[in-house]
A protein has these predicted regions:
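Bacterial N-terminal signal peptides that target proteins for export
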Residues: 1-7
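N-terminal signal peptide c-region/cleavage motif recognized by signal peptidases
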Residues: 14-19
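Hydrophobic alpha-helical transmembrane segments of integral membrane proteins
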Residues: 10-11
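Compact, glycine-rich, soluble single-domain proteins
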Residues: 20-143
Length: 143
C-alpha cells in the first residue's frame, strides 16, 4: 500500500466510526386500530436517517404481534396492489415516510387486545446487525 493510500485510509477512519455510532430515529409512529378484532393492522410514521451513510432495514418485529412486515401499496393499472418490501434503504440525511397508501408496516395477529392510546414497541433490524426501536401509538381510525 502506498503512503498516499495509507493517509487516505487514516482520514476515513473518523467517518467510519461516526457512521457506525450514528443511529436513525423513528418519529410520529402510530397504528391504525381496525374495528372488530381484525387480524391485521397497519403502522405508520417516519424513520429519519441523519447519518452520513445509508442504512437498510431488513426486518421488523414486535412482542405485540405474531409478525411484522414492511409493505408498499401502489396503484398499478388502476388497481391498488400491496407487496412486501424485502429491504428498505434510507439515504444519508434521508427519511422513509410510512403512510396510508404507500410504505407501511403490516402488523399481523396481535397477541393482545389493543386500545386507543396503547403504546407498542417495534424493533427494526438493520443490515449491519444493529437494532432500532420505535414506539407507536394505537389510534382509532378517522371516520
Amino acid at each position: 500500500m502506498t503512503l498516499r493510500a495509507c493517509l487516505f485510509a487514516l482520514l476515513l477512519l473518523p467517518l467510519a466510526a461516526t457512521a457506525r455510532d450514528c443511529t436513525p430515529r423513528v418519529k410520529d409512529g402510530w397504528i391504525r386500530l381496525l374495528p372488530g378484532g381484525m387480524p391485521m393492522q397497519a403502522g405508520f410514521g417516519r424513520i429519519d436517517n441523519h447519518c452520513p451513510m445509508p442504512v437498510t432495514i431488513v426486518s421488523a418485529s414486535s412482542p405485540a404481534y405474531a409478525s411484522v412486515e414492511l409493505h408498499e401499496s401502489k396503484v398499478v393499472d388502476g388497481v391498488n396492489r400491496m407487496r412486501a418490501v424485502p429491504e428498505l434503504r434510507i439515504a444519508p440525511d434521508g427519511a422513509a415516510v410510512l403512510q396510508p397508501g404507500g410504505l407501511h408496516l403490516m402488523l399481523m395477529k396481535p397477541k393482545a387486545t389493543l386500545k386507543p392510546g396503547s403504546r407498542v414497541v417495534i424493533e427494526f433490524s438493520l443490515k449491519d446487525g444493529r437494532k432500532l426501536l420505535g414506539e407507536f401509538e394505537v389510534r382509532k381510525p378517522v371516520p
